[in-house]
Amino acid sequence: MYRFVTSNRHKFEEVSEMAALYGIEIEWVRMKYEEIQDDSTERISYDSCNKLSRIVEAPYFVDDSGLFINALRGFPGPYSNYVSSTIGNEGILKIMDDVDDRTAYFLTVVSMNEGHSITQFIGKVMGKIARSIRGSNGFGYDPIFIPEGSDRTFAEMDIKAKNAISHRSIAFRGLFEYIKMNQTAKK
């Protein structure tokens, strides 16, 4: 049984649906944990995974995600959670009000501790910031992020459509394919 350590119910639901497609059952370890403040999403995810080894039985995984807005030099980036909880989507839109370059990307880094090592999986999706909040599905920045090739925000998509293209789904597909490959190799 693989454990997903997160306090975010929405994340767990998204990831559970993806895991089921691979025939992988995951357990939710609902837990808040302290993250280091760092400019690297990869380091934040790795450090969290490493620290949790003292209290969570392997195998388990964590993820860290960020929204990186090009015109704002990557802000909010690895500080996305804090920015979301303080100024929210309205604040981001206000900062972006007179900005023409609305290109951005979402990045997710999944770190899995197998007991002997930590392996990372990265997912990235390019897109742009909408001019208004749109949609009611998803969470976080979903109502203001329009993925490349779409005219809808993530929040305007159902979970299946979002999971087909999102940064989180790319990273977690990498994880689940890795798990399946290792399960096959052990047989």
Curated annotation (Swiss-Prot):
EC identifiers of the protein: 3.6.1.66
Alphabetized InterPro entries for the sequence: dITP/XTP_pyrophosphatase (IPR020922), ITPase-like_fam (IPR029001), RdgB/HAM1 (IPR002637)
Active site, UniProt feature: 64
Manner of cofactor binding, per the entry note: Binds 1 Mg(2+) ion per subunit.
Reaction it catalyzes: XTP + H2O = XMP + diphosphate + H(+); dITP + H2O = dIMP + diphosphate + H(+); ITP + H2O = IMP + diphosphate + H(+)
Pfam families named among the record's database cross-references: Ham1p_like (PF01725)
SUPFAM superfamilies per the UniProt record, alphabetical: ITPase-like
Cofactor: Mg(2+)
Residues the record lists as binding Mg(2+): 35, 64
Designated name of the protein: dITP/XTP pyrophosphatase
KW Magnesium (keyword) present: yes
UniProt GO MF annotations: dITP diphosphatase activity; ITP diphosphatase activity; metal ion binding; nucleotide binding; ribonucleoside triphosphate phosphatase activity; XTP diphosphatase activity
Top-level enzyme category: hydrolase
Similarity section: Belongs to the HAM1 NTPase family.
Functional summary from the UniProt entry: Pyrophosphatase that catalyzes the hydrolysis of nucleoside triphosphates to their monophosphate derivatives, with a high preference for the non-canonical purine nucleotides XTP (xanthosine triphosphate), dITP (deoxyinosine triphosphate) and ITP. Seems to function as a house-cleaning enzyme that removes non-canonical purine nucleotides from the nucleotide pool, thus preventing their incorporation into DNA/RNA and avoiding chromosomal lesions.
Gene source species: Thermoplasma acidophilum (strain ATCC 25905 / DSM 1728 / JCM 9062 / NBRC 15155 / AMRC-C165)
Record's keyword terms, sorted: Hydrolase, Magnesium, Metal-binding, Nucleotide metabolism, Nucleotide-binding
